[in-house]
Amino acid sequence: MRVALLVIGRPRHAGLADAIRDYEGRAAHYWPLDVIEVKEEPGRNLSADVVREREAERLVARLPADAVVVACDPGGVTMDSAQFARWLQEQRESARNVAFVIGGAHGLGPAVRERANRRLSLAPWTLPHEVARMVMAEQLYRAGTIIRGEPYHK
């Protein structure tokens, strides 16, 4: 099983970028991890809807063809860390690749939601997309430690 993490843009804040790289590196010890950074739409004179649509087109174009697509979206299902680890383990046992998609500053466009096999809420709050990326990377790492019975998860 391969895990892809599709995100809009690169982290702008140095401290957050360091934390993201750290957790993505840790997660890669448990799952073959492909981080795919898609160009952010410069939306200075565009509506949020247009920005979402253009970014969604780019994200969908980069999705692995054979992956179970999970849209990270506040309206999705919630799982605690143990449930998330079990779900990932089920995907691994079924030899399914998984692609998690995190939208940009304006969220995910309809094209991503339509392509998604499921929607996952990372929190009931609105998160900056860089923070959502860090949370997703940390949860991938945590899920790996749960599955292996390592002491990180308490």
From Swiss-Prot:
CDD domains: RlmH-like (cd18081)
Catalyzed chemical reaction(s): pseudouridine(1915) in 23S rRNA + S-adenosyl-L-methionine = N(3)-methylpseudouridine(1915) in 23S rRNA + S-adenosyl-L-homocysteine + H(+)
Major subcellular location class: cytoplasm
Top enzyme class: transferase
Gene Ontology CC entries for this record: cytoplasm
UniProt xrefs under Pfam families: SPOUT_MTase (PF02590)
Transmembrane annotation, as ranges: none
EC identifiers of the protein: 2.1.1.177
Keywords linked to the UniProt accession: Cytoplasm, Methyltransferase, rRNA processing, S-adenosyl-L-methionine, Transferase
InterPro entries: Alpha/beta_knot_MTases (IPR029028), RlmH-like (IPR003742), tRNA_m1G_MTases_N (IPR029026)
Residues bound to S-adenosyl-L-methionine: G103
Subcellular localization, as worded in the UniProt entry: Cytoplasm
GO molecular function: rRNA (pseudouridine-N3-)-methyltransferase activity
Quaternary organization: Homodimer.
Role, per record: Specifically methylates the pseudouridine at position 1915 (m3Psi1915) in 23S rRNA.
Family assignment from sequence similarity: Belongs to the RNA methyltransferase RlmH family.
Protein name: Ribosomal RNA large subunit methyltransferase H
Native organism: Gemmatimonas aurantiaca (strain DSM 14586 / JCM 11422 / NBRC 100505 / T-27)
